[in-house]
Swiss-Prot record:
UniProt entry keywords in alphabetical sequence: Cell membrane, Flavoprotein, FMN, Membrane, Oxidoreductase, Pyrimidine biosynthesis
Gene from which the chain derives: pyrD
Name of the molecule in the record: Dihydroorotate dehydrogenase (quinone)
Annotated function: Catalyzes the conversion of dihydroorotate to orotate with quinone as electron acceptor.
A GO BP entry: 'de novo' UMP biosynthetic process
């Protein structure tokens, strides 16, 4: 059924302006029949951050910015969904056009700028679906014009703790000026200290909601050392590696589109983001799990990301080119790999190639 839907919808959506196509996809999912998803093979189950994931495939933040369709996405077979980025106040984001397809590269450039309906609207939607179950994380960000960006994160933690399965602290978007500075040592330490304190203040009414940190792929290894050290010292529950890149690989074929400002995602990000997963994995030393993001467009790519050190993976841009059927395809491929190799679970292979990957030459961009 999903494959038939993809066959009909993908040509139409790709003909439309990218942002109009995205809006149409959201509207279509709002009317998705409430069908029960196919049960996942138990071998795909993952335990991470104190949560039980039915499978390791998540919808990355950026697709459902304001919590309009998390349950529809779960019914399509995702093991978890991350909504956002949400900011305290609504904001329209950067001027259009701000979303670009690089068709021949199977890539996307965006400079959206945290456009979303604001915390009140997203909170109301998540509260209304609380009884539905499923893992729905909340990616939190700061308003562009905020005089206290760290305070924005604190407000969101306190507000969403009762309805969030986990939080992602997004300090790595390249589309809000100055935001990536919060990845730097003392600033990051202050941010995480205040976020964890906020989580502790609402623990009694909301439980121990996991806090994850999402980082950029453009960090130097020295910067990564500092980020991991701070994350470990502040006892975050995990990291998401990685956000979009501001780099432009020399191999990009859509040369004119590649000049657009913003974050690059999709297939060209795969090698860099996977290397960053491996580099992070060896530095974390098992202190917490990782979520791998960037260029996952097949079962083989998902497996590579897991072997680099990711316990879970997320995708988004690849759906633009492969359709929603990609989720079930990846799950089938992962299950087949486990059966063929006699493994009982994906945890048996997490990080198996990390040492090898970190010894290789740095992937060219």
């Amino acid at each position: 059924m999903i494959r038939a839907f993809d066959a009909l919808s993908l040509p139409v959506l790709r003909w439309l302006d990218p942002e109009d196509a995205h809006r149409l996809a959201i509207q279509g999912l709002r009317f998705l029949p409430p069908v029960k998803p196919r049960a996942d093979d138990p071998k795909l189950a993952v335990r991470a951050f104190g949560l039980n994931f039915p499978n390791p495939i998540g919808m990355a933040a950026g697709f459902d910015k304001s919590a309009e369709v998390p349950d529809a996405l779960l019914r399509l077979g995702f093991g978890f969904v991350e909504i956002g980025s949400v900011t305290p106040k609504p904001q329209s984001g950067n001027p259009r056009p701000r979303l670009f397809r690089l068709e021949r590269d199977e890539a996307v450039i965006n400079r959206m700028g945290f456009n979303n309906d604001g915390a009140d609207v997203a909170l109301r939607r998540l509260a209304a679906r609380a009884q539905h179950g499923g893992i729905v994380g909340v990616n939190v960000g700061a308003n562009k014009d905020s005089p206290d960006r760290v305070g924005d994160y604190v407000k969101l933690i306190e507000a969403f703790a009762p309805v969030a399965s986990y939080f992602t602290i997004n300090v790595s978007s390249p589309n809000t000026p100055g935001l990536r500075n919060l990845q730097e040592g003392a600033l990051l330490d202050d941010l995480l200290a205040r976020v964890i304190d906020a989580r502790e203040r609402v623990r009694q009414k909301a439980g121990d909601t996991p806090v994850l940190l999402k980082i950029a792929p453009d960090l130097s290894l020295a910067q990564l050392d500092d980020v991991v050290q701070v994350a470990r010292s502040r006892r975050v529950d995990g990291m998401i590696v990685s956000n979009t890149t501001i780099a432009r690989p020399s191999t990009l074929r859509e040369e004119m589109r590649a000049k657009e400002q913003g974050g690059l995602s999709g297939r060209p990000l795969f090698r860099l983001s996977t290397r960053m997963v491996a580099e992070t994995y060896v530095r974390v030393e098992g202190a917490f799990p990782l979520v791998g993001v960037g260029g996952v467009d097949s079962g083989g790519a998902a497996l590579t990301k897991i072997r680099a050190g990711a316990s879970l993976i997320q995708l988004y841009s690849s759906l633009v080119y492969k359709g929603l059927g990609l989720v079930e395809e990846i799950k089938r491929d992962l299950t087949s790999t486990l059966l063929r190799t006699g493994r009982d679970s994906l945890s048996d292979i997490v990080g198996a190639d990390a040492a090898t990957l970190t010894a290789e030459d740095w992937p060219g961009m």
